[in-house]
């Protein structure tokens, strides 16, 4: 039986990645909806993108009412802005919440109905073009066909999926991660570690995902402590951005396992940051599956020099 491997159409990474992607972004449409959050507006991070759009003569509207654990109500409000402003493509600037929100808004803009309607279904209708610019090194959402949105009526986190949710362009520019505080750096970095290690020990692992997962694990162990101690270290931030991207590619194709399966309800019920809930479960979950993936855990240990 063969394997399928899905990635964004184009990936720009490293220093000045946004600038390198500028000409491509300008071809995606006439007016962008920039999906972001209040902190990215306050820090001026979103302005880095809107300045580029101004330079390229691309019109845009901004929807910045995204908070952690985005909800179906936020998606509905964002869709209203998208339609009212006659936008035809989307750019997300932020952590996993704005990127997941962008995907959900894009999906409903073409599929219709409410995002809640797609729980348990594969989203298949093509979306408008999407650009994902992460400001944390962890979620990997810029390289996945998944989005997680909270259903406010049922108080559950919905895992929604479909290849059409894969962003067309992923931009991992370390300049966007320099303002992440220590707490966010640690939590999102551990999220990336869980993505990579779960993908590597998954029954769905394949040769290509193995390469991405092991590369990510090695980078995370080397560079996450550096980023935590010195958030202004551009090289370390660049390597962590790349590691998060690699981990996202790995789990997008190999899936995550027991850690993420158990952490999702914790986040929904107690609103614990996603990376923290994963970290809380990591030791217990991997102890539980250790015997079934002994050789795989040995491989990971060798990669980090244990």
Language-model features: locations:
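ATP/NTP phosphate-donor binding region
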Residues: 1-89
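Structural motif
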Residues: 10, 31-33, 60-61, 88-91, ...
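Short glycine/serine/threonine-rich phosphate/pyrophosphate-binding segments
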Residues: 18-21, 42-45, 72-73, 97-103, ...
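Glycine/threonine-rich beta-strand-loop-alpha-helix active-site module
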Residues: 73-175
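Glycine-rich phosphate/pyrophosphate-binding beta-alpha loops
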Residues: 138, 245-275
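Carboxylate- and glycine-rich phosphate/diphosphate-binding segment that chelates Mg2+/Mn2+
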Residues: 146-254
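Gly/Pro-rich interdomain helix-loop hinge
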Residues: 266-306
């Amino acid at each position: 039986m063969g394997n399928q491997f899905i990635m964004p159409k184009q990936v720009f990474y490293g220093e000045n990645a946004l600038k390198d992607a500028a000409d491509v972004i300008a071809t995606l449409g006439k007016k962008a909806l920039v999906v972001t959050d209040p902190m990215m507006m306050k820090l001026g991070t979103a302005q880095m993108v809107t300045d580029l759009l101004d330079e390229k003569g691309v019109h845009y509207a901004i929807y910045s009412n995204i908070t952690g654990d985005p909800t179906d109500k936020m998606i509905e409000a964002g869709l209203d802005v998208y339609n009212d402003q006659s936008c035809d493509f989307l750019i997300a600037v932020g952590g996993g919440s704005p990127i997941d929100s962008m995907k959900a808004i894009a999906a409903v803009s073409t599929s219709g109905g409410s995002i809640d309607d797609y729980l348990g279904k594969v989203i298949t209708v093509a979306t408008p073009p999407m650009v994902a610019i992460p400001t944390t090194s962890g979620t990997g959402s810029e390289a996945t066909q998944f989005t997680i949105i909270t259903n406010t009526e049922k108080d559950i986190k919905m895992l929604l999926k479909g290849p059409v949710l894969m962003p067309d362009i992923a931009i991992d520019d370390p300049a966007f991660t320099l303002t992440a505080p220590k707490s966010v750096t640690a939590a999102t970095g551990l999220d990336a570690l869980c993505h990579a290690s779960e993908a590597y020990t998954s029954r769905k692992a394949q040769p290509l995902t193995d390469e991405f997962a092991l590369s990510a694990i090695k980078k995370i162990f080397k560079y996450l402590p550096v980023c935590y101690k010195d958030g202004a270290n551009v090289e370390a931030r660049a390597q962590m951005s790349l590691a998060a991207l690699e981990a996202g590619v790995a789990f997008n194709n190999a899936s995550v396992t027991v850690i993420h399966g158990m952490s999702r309800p914790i986040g929904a019920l107690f609103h614990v940051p996603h990376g923290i809930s994963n970290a809380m479960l990591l030791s217990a979950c991997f102890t539980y599956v250790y015997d079934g993936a002994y050789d795989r855990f040995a491989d990971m240990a060798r990669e980090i020099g244990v």
